[in-house]
């Protein structure tokens, strides 16, 4: 994979429900995919009192606690944008990487546009499930993270903590990239 001018940033969010605006983004975790020690995380104040009980249960987060301890969404997005700018040089392109990227990107995109007016990731995201689907030629059913892990054998795991999950996704991304390189050599 060419990475000389592209900085792949693994991003994970935890939310109170399935769509931005009606539901809140509760936390952001991110790391540079090929340098995961370069990382960012924050908790956000809810923008809505709406929630799906199962979404809250899986995160272990509380809207009440986040009203007190979370960052104002403007501050959170400013900090996230500043972090992104700190890991990307002027001649480099930042690429959003996610597992089910369409979900995480929709919240990040919404919050960046509503609170800052633009999204430093632009209009596209690289989806790890789709990347694996293309590399492995597996069925879509076999692109779940638990199924991918059986093949690529990551050392980390996801646990619905946004930063932990971003680091896990970054590891899956690197391992799938390595698998892709191996398949090229096998041809």
UniProtKB/Swiss-Prot annotation:
<feature type="domain" description="Exonuclease">
    <location>
        <begin position="9"/>
        <end position="173"/>
    </location>
</feature>
<dbReference type="GO" id="GO:0051607">
    <property type="term" value="P:defense response to virus"/>
</dbReference>
<feature type="binding site">
    <location>
        <position position="25"/>
    </location>
    <ligand>
        <name>Mg(2+) 2</name>
    </ligand>
</feature>
<dbReference type="Pfam" id="PF00929">
    <property type="entry name" value="RNase_T"/>
</dbReference>
<dbReference type="InterPro" id="IPR013520">
    <property type="entry name" value="Exonuclease_RNaseT/DNA_pol3"/>
</dbReference>
<dbReference type="InterPro" id="IPR036397">
    <property type="entry name" value="RNaseH_sf"/>
</dbReference>
<comment type="function">
    <text>Effector component of a CBASS antivirus system. CBASS (cyclic oligonucleotide-based antiphage signaling system) provides immunity against bacteriophage. The CD-NTase protein synthesizes cyclic nucleotides in response to infection; these serve as specific second messenger signals. The signals activate a diverse range of effectors, leading to bacterial cell death and thus abortive phage infection. A type III CBASS system. A sequence non-specific 3'-5' DNA exonuclease that preferentially degrades ssDNA with 3' overhangs or a mismatch at the 3' end.</text>
</comment>
<feature type="binding site">
    <location>
        <position position="12"/>
    </location>
    <ligand>
        <name>Mg(2+) 2</name>
    </ligand>
</feature>
<dbReference type="InterPro" id="IPR012337">
    <property type="entry name" value="RNaseH-like_sf"/>
</dbReference>
<dbReference type="GO" id="GO:0046872">
    <property type="term" value="F:metal ion binding"/>
</dbReference>
<keyword id="KW-0479">Metal-binding</keyword>
<feature type="active site" description="Proton donor/acceptor">
    <location>
        <position position="160"/>
    </location>
</feature>
<dbReference type="GO" id="GO:0006259">
    <property type="term" value="P:DNA metabolic process"/>
</dbReference>
<feature type="binding site">
    <location>
        <position position="165"/>
    </location>
    <ligand>
        <name>Mg(2+) 2</name>
    </ligand>
</feature>
<protein>
    <recommendedName>
        <fullName>3'-5' DNA exonuclease Cap18</fullName>
        <ecNumber>3.1.-.-</ecNumber>
    </recommendedName>
</protein>
<dbReference type="GO" id="GO:0005829">
    <property type="term" value="C:cytosol"/>
</dbReference>
<keyword id="KW-0460">Magnesium</keyword>
<dbReference type="GO" id="GO:0003676">
    <property type="term" value="F:nucleic acid binding"/>
</dbReference>
<comment type="subunit">
    <text>Homodimer.</text>
</comment>
<feature type="binding site">
    <location>
        <position position="12"/>
    </location>
    <ligand>
        <name>Mg(2+) 1</name>
    </ligand>
</feature>
<dbReference type="GO" id="GO:0008408">
    <property type="term" value="F:3'-5' exonuclease activity"/>
</dbReference>
<keyword id="KW-0378">Hydrolase</keyword>
<keyword id="KW-0269">Exonuclease</keyword>
<comment type="similarity">
    <text>Belongs to the Cap18 exonuclease family.</text>
</comment>
<keyword id="KW-0051">Antiviral defense</keyword>
<feature type="binding site">
    <location>
        <position position="160"/>
    </location>
    <ligand>
        <name>Mg(2+) 2</name>
    </ligand>
</feature>
<keyword id="KW-0540">Nuclease</keyword>
């Amino acid at each position: 994979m060419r990475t000389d001018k592209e900085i792949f940033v693994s991003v994970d969010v935890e939310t109170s429900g399935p769509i931005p605006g009606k539901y809140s983004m509760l936390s952001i975790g991110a790391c540079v995919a090929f340098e995961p020690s370069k990382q960012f995380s924050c908790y956000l104040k809810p923008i809505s009192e709406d929630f799906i009980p199962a979404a809250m249960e899986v995160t272990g987060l509380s809207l009440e606690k986040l009203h007190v301890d979370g960052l104002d969404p403007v501050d959170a997005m400013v900090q996230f944008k500043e972090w992104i700018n700190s890991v990307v040089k002027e001649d480099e392109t930042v690429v959003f990487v996610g597992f089910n990227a369409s979900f995480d990107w929709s919240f990040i995109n919404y919050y960046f546009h509503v609170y800052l007016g633009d999204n430093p990731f632009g209009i596209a995201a690289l989806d790890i499930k789709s990347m694996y689907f293309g590399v492995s030629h597996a069925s879509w059913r076999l692109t779940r993270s638990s199924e991918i892990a059986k093949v690529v054998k990551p050392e980390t795991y996801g646990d619905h903590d946004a930063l932990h999950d971003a680091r896990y996704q970054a590891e899956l991304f690197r391992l799938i990239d390595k698998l892709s390189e191996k398949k090229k050599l096998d041809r």
